Amino acid sequence: MTYSLYEHNRVKKFFKKHKRDKVLLLRITKKYCEILDNPYNAEFIELTSVKCPKCHRARVGNYRIIFYVSEKYQRIEIIDIIPRKNDYKLL
């Protein structure tokens, strides 16, 4: 099953802010490929947040990729990339 990828504006803002950190951006794009291959991997933990009850989290160093899998539209929505220290205060 193939999924399309959709990024929210907060993710685009994150990439603009960190465009000089090529190593981090490369690690995030590799994790994107892993998410697209298998979004229900055991490595990606499902969150129990009130605001986003069916969201998952993927770990990339000190950052977390928060994403949602929409089976209806066959798409993965990357909601946000947040630092670990602010991990769940925003959700």
Where are these regions (language model features)?
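Residue-level signal for beta-strand positions within conserved beta-sheet cores that form or flank
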Residues: 1, 43, 54, 74-77
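Arg/Lys-rich, positively charged N-terminal/basic patches that mediate binding to nucleic acids
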Residues: 1-31
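Enriched for short, Lys/Arg-rich terminal
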Residues: 4, 16, 23-25, 60-63, ...
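Residues that form or immediately flank small-molecule/cofactor binding pockets and catalytic motifs
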Residues: 10, 49-52, 83
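Alpha-helix N-cap/helix-start and coil->helix boundary motif
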Residues: 12, 41, 84-85
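Short, flexible helix/strand-to-coil boundary loops that buttress conserved ligand/catalytic motifs
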Residues: 28, 39, 91
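Conserved short hydrophobic interaction patches
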Residues: 31-34, 84
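A short, surface-exposed loop/turn module that caps and links secondary-structure elements
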Residues: 33-58
